[in-house]
């Protein structure tokens, strides 16, 4: 469906303004769809992102600093998210005896199981781009990379 219909706006200042609004709108649309899937597993989008980072580092621990650097949403509070995951038993942490500021974080078996269940639902994530051909998906990826570049 066209953006103009979705947000009931007939005109934009120009095409660059329209793409900005379109990207923000599309982010919200995808986030809503993905949040529903994550909610089924008792986690948020940000918690999912952190779990994926932890799994990528596994079996080695990682630090809050590295998590923060790799997060998709740079404005998220990585320490708070890790604490929520710890409370749910999806992540664990180890505070250094020598330096109390150094905290190692790692994913638990329960956290891995949640990600495995979400991996099985990967097709649901991919269905959101099913209206695009593979060539269009590749082109969109290139254009988005170029825009940020």
Stretch-by-stretch model annotation:
Residues 22, 49-53, 113, 139:
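Pre-recognition alpha-helix immediately N-terminal to the DNA-recognition helix
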């Amino acid at each position: 469906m066209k953006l103009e219909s979705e947000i009931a706006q007939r005109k934009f200042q120009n095409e660059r303004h329209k793409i900005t609004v379109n990207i923000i709108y599309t982010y919200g649309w995808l986030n809503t769809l993905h949040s529903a899937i994550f909610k089924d597993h008792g986690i948020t989008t940000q918690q999912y992102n952190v779990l994926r980072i932890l799994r990528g580092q596994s079996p080695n621990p990682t630090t809050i600093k590295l998590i923060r650097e790799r997060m998709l949403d740079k404005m998220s509070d990585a320490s708070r998210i890790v604490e929520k995951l710890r409370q749910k038993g999806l992540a664990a942490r180890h505070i250094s005896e020598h330096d109390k500021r150094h905290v190692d974080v790692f994913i638990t078996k329960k956290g891995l199981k949640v990600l495995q269940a979400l991996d099985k639902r990967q097709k649901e994530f991919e269905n959101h781009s099913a209206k695009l051909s593979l060539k269009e998906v590749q082109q969109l990826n290139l254009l988005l990379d170029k825009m940020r570049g």
